[in-house]
Structure formats: structure tokens, C-alpha cells
Amino acid sequence: MRLVKKNVIINGIYEAGVRYPEPANISYLWNFGFFSLVCLIIQLVSGILLAMHYSAHVDLAFNSIERLVREVDFGWLLRYVHANGASFFFIVVYVHMLRGLYFGSYQKPNAMLWVSGVVIFLLLIITGFLGYVLPWGQMSYWAATVITNLVTVIPVVGEDIVIWLWGGFNVDNPTLNRFFSLHYLCPFIIVGLVGLHIIFLRENGSTNPLGVKSNVDQIPFTPYFTIKDLFSFMIFLVLFFAFVFFAPNYLGHPDNYLMADSNVTPAHIVPEWYLLPFYAMLRSIPNKVLGVLALVLAIVVLAFLPFLTISEVRSSYFRKIHKHLFWSFLALCFFLGFLGSQPAAAPYLTCGLYSTILYFVYILVLFPYIYMVEKVIIKSILKTNKK
């Protein structure tokens, strides 16, 4: 113990991983932050190994991945771990964020913790899109063409930015090189932001299901939460490798097993499943500028939740109306994801437009201000009980 106390690094690890106090009543939903870190490590390691075999050239990219899968020892494992790792990364991040919404973890004094998380989420989306292009399959190529074209809505400099992204006048070899470089860089930026996120977490400590301060009822991280994390980690690995070994392409798209062809347009251009709700918002609005604005604001607006919310009570555990709102909001998100996977035709576009409006009503109006309604109801109940 004396050696631990003397060494700054060892003592820091000891304090963070052994003695760090956590609320005694936190549930397994709080493990998804740990899962996010696990997924980030999986993606970093598998991505670096994949980059050793990848050729960022339009004539070689598709074949280099096929060669990796067919000829390199355990190359198939590398590819499917990385591909499914991205999907699982988004699953755990979505659950992590939804848990924050449900239990009010985004409210002050954790505002900066939430904002840093939204920034990480935005960077994850960018990284995921860049990686989706790299296999240079049919869906990769056309997704890159459609999404990069959206940058043209930026006034004055939009056209110039698109030409710079493309490295020419259409998606081609320079585009692939740029996307590969940025996709390789972004995870390391995310690592830095995760470090900042953890610093903000340590500043005020973890929240809990009741949404109240728990300075008294706390227990050390080890052994209680270490065992809890290890148990849930084993379950996570079982589920993850079940997809890797038995359904490696279930979360992918079959068109990406066809080499990119600029002369053949897929019948239905879609991004990865985890971006479908935002894609539904983008295409449901007829005006291109407003569609892109809705797409960006749908993510950015989440960062303003801590500053819009006026509730004195955090957790939905004590807020029945907020609880029902949360579950209806979750159903809306699933519905938007379904709409994003469907062809761009009626009635999907009409439903998408109304769902997009409803999404912003939830975030900007209902979640922040429903507390006023709850407060009036509580006061009326208290008055009735007094009588």
C-alpha cells in the first residue's frame, strides 16, 4: 500500500478503479458507459489491424477487403469484429444516452458531462459514416455521393468544400483517400474526448436512479461494481460474438458485397441502420436546406437539454407523465428508424415529416417544460388530500 501511495500513476489508478465511491443503488443500466469504452477499444484495435491490410484506392479497396476475408489468417474475424463492433458501439451509446434522458442525468450540475457526450456522439456518427464508405461497395459509393452533396447547402463555401472533399468533380480516388485518413484520425480524437468526459464525470460523481445526491450512501467501486461490470461484460461478449460468428452480415447491407459502380444506382440508397432515424428526417423534408438543417439540429439540439430543462426533480422514477413521454419518444425514434429504411415515397415521407416535427416538439418543448404540468397536478393533489 505504501508503494501505491508513493507512485502518482499507480495511486491514480487505485483511486479511480478501487476506492472510487459510487452510489449503492445504481443498476445495470449504468454499465453501458463501461460497455462504450469496451467497444471503443475493440474498434481501435481491430481498426488498426484492418488498416494494415487495406488499400485506399478505388481499384484496390474492395478487393483488398475480399482478400483479407478469404486469404489472410483470421482476416474474416477482423472484418466482422470491426463491422459488428460499430453496430454494438451505437447500441450501447444509444442505451447510455436514453438512460440519461430517463433518469435526468443530463440536468445540472452534469450539464458539461452531457454536452461532452453529445459531442462524442456527433463524432461517432461522422466516424461511422466515413467507415461505411471504405469497403467501396455499391452502397458505400452511393451513400458517399448523396451525403457529401448535402454540404452544398452551406452558403458561399458549400460548393468549394464538396470539391475539396471529393478531390475533383465527383466521388473518386482522392475522396476515398480523404475518408480513410479522417476515419483513422477520428477515433483518436474520440479517445481524447472520452478522457474529458470521464473528467467531467469525476467532478460531480455518478448519478443514480433516484436522481438525488448520494454522498452518504456510497460504496467503493471494487469489489462491488467490478464484479458487476465483469458479469455484464461476459454477457455482452456472448451477444457480440454470437453476431460475429453466426450472423456477421445481419446488421449490414447486401449491396455492399457488390463492387462500386458509378453507372448503376441501387434501387434504395440507405445508410447503416444506426443512422436511419436521422436519414428519415433528412429526406422527409422537401426543401434540401431545411432537410440538412433538421438533420444537424436533431443531434445538436440534444446538447441544449440541460439548459432548457427547469425541472427540480430529475428522475422519471418520481415523474409519471415524464415516464410516459419518454417511452412514447423511444417509440417515435424506432418509428423514424423504420421510415428511414423504407423507399422514399408516400406514405413514408409524409409520416417522416410529421415524426420529425414531433421529435423536435419532444426535445424542445415537452421534455424541458412538462415539469410545470406535473407541478400543477401535484399541488392540486396535495390540496385535495388536505381537505
From Swiss-Prot:
GO cellular component, one term: respiratory chain complex III
Keywords, sorted A to Z: Electron transport, Heme, Iron, Membrane, Metal-binding, Mitochondrion, Mitochondrion inner membrane, Respiratory chain, Transmembrane, Transmembrane helix, Transport, Ubiquinone
SUPFAM superfamilies: a domain/subunit of cytochrome bc1 complex (Ubiquinol-cytochrome c reductase), Transmembrane di-heme cytochromes
Cofactor note: Binds 2 heme b groups non-covalently.
Protein topology in the membrane: Multi-pass membrane protein
Gene3D superfamilies named in the record: Cytochrome Bc1 Complex, Chain C (1.20.810.10)
Main localization, broad class: mitochondrion
Other information: Heme 1 (or BL or b562) is low-potential and absorbs at about 562 nm, and heme 2 (or BH or b566) is high-potential and absorbs at about 566 nm.
Family: Belongs to the cytochrome b family.
Stated name of the protein: Cytochrome b
Species of provenance: Dictyostelium citrinum
Gene: cytB
